[in-house]
Amino acid sequence: MAWPRIFQRGALLSRFSHHHMVVFLLTFFSYSLLHASRKTFSNVKVSISKQWTPSAFNKSTELLPVEIWSSNHLFPSAEEATLFLGMLDTIFLFSYAVGLFISGIVGDRLNLRWVLSFGMCSSALVVFVFGTLTEWLHFYNKGLYCSLWIVNGLLQSTGWPCVVAVMGNWFGKAGRGVVFGLWSACASVGNILGACLASSVLQYGYEYAFLVTAAVQFAGGIIIFFGLLVSPEEIGIPGIETEDNFEEDSHRPLINGAENEDEAEPNYSIQEGNTVTQVKAISFYQACCLPGVIAYSLAYACLKLVNYSFFFWLPFYLSNNFGWKEAEADQLSIWYDVGGIIGGTLQGFISDMLQKRAPVLALSLLLAIGSLVGYSRSPNDKSINALLMAVTGFFIGGPSNMISSAISADLGRQELIQGSSEALATVTGIVDGTGSIGAAVGQYLVSLIQDNLGWMWVFYFFILMTSCTVLFISPLIVRETCSLMQRRQTRVLNE
């Protein structure tokens, strides 16, 4: 089996400069900060609910005038406040999903650095107004909260398509799986960062949790504006298209099923003066028609539903099903993220060695079905539960990270469009936007199934969605597996 050039002796030093490392870190932490603000909202829900409802020791006491003493009581009970907070989650996910489709198109037409910086800074201001300014002014309004969270979802959606596009500009397809697998841990790091920032100041009031998160995110947006290099061409380094077009036959784009014998002419042009011609962004419809985009988008809608359900519901499931303390359940749920980080990195490495993604995904998702069956029958033991949780995260979180990052980059840099059009951000927006719609619908369905049928049927639902993920990419799995076998037979005959 041929090793990708990036793993061969001396290839890493020759291909990657300190600029690559800076881009890796800046994009990693920019998305981590966006995820941190989402996690902050989850961590302060209890405090917000208490602020929006009457205090227990005041229920039997009528304080006059009522307009002053009860102005912050949006809801008569904590249950109604919790329901509204859950509705805000759904509103955010739907607006985020819609925004992903728009942000991808905008990112391919404007400077990615501008779009990402604008999204981070503007989102930070919205978070500040939502959680801090309204509390300082004691202004509480359900319509305002909903409007702000819709805007926040749209602004946060600028993050993922832009950072994936920038990473795709800097890192070629050789080694992209392992690089993106490691890089996609940014969301998990952001969750941890958000929890730490919120818990450090929550004792002073939930508004300060929003203030600290918003301030750090705004500062990150400023750093991105002045420090991020969108592509190697900005500093005179040859683009990855130039390098990738001279790869040998075995290093063709990983989402292509067939390996044509006829070598196509490099699909890029050079102007006089050795400057790359200005490329044109493709339309939304053209991006959808690219091979593999619709298949992976539908597959990701099913898989992200399962992955985000674990993200939102895992601590509640552990507390509700096993009777463990909320703090213990929160700490234990980290093992799912750990499994996802390891899974995304290792599976990306294997797919780089095979130069194919779909067969690796297929095997992982089939094993994910078994891990879901095993985890649904986990005993009331924290150690065993953590182990099964990590295994489940490995086989579900790993493929989810790979589709949203490495595969999206592959899809946006196919030979069909390479060097003649920009599609990376648009394709990433389509894939992640479709996935987010599935995740938004899934949160409601999980709640409905759990209330009426119980947790075991929730796991049956997860198994069904994981099976649908395999079904949607089955043509790609068959095509790439056959191509892999043909290549192996050719190598054996040549030997």
From Swiss-Prot:
Residues forming coiled coils: none
Glycosylation sites: 58, 267
Subcellular location: Endoplasmic reticulum membrane; Lysosome membrane
Species of origin: Bos taurus
Native organism taxonomy: Eukaryota, Metazoa, Chordata, Craniata, Vertebrata
Stored Pfam families: MFS_1 (PF07690)
Gene giving rise to this polypeptide: SLC37A3
Designated name of the protein: Sugar phosphate exchanger 3
Function: Unlike the other SLC37 members, lacks glucose-6-phosphate antiporter activity. In osteoclasts, forms a transporter complex with ATRAID for nitrogen-containing-bisphophonates (N-BPs) required for releasing N-BP molecules that have trafficked to lysosomes through fluid-phase endocytosis into the cytosol.
Alphabetical UniProt keywords: Endoplasmic reticulum, Glycoprotein, Lysosome, Membrane, Sugar transport, Transmembrane, Transmembrane helix, Transport
Family: Belongs to the major facilitator superfamily. Organophosphate:Pi antiporter (OPA) (TC 2.A.1.4) family.
GO molecular function, one term: xenobiotic transmembrane transporter activity
Oligomer and partners: Interacts with ATRAID; the interaction is direct and both proteins are mutually dependent for their stability.
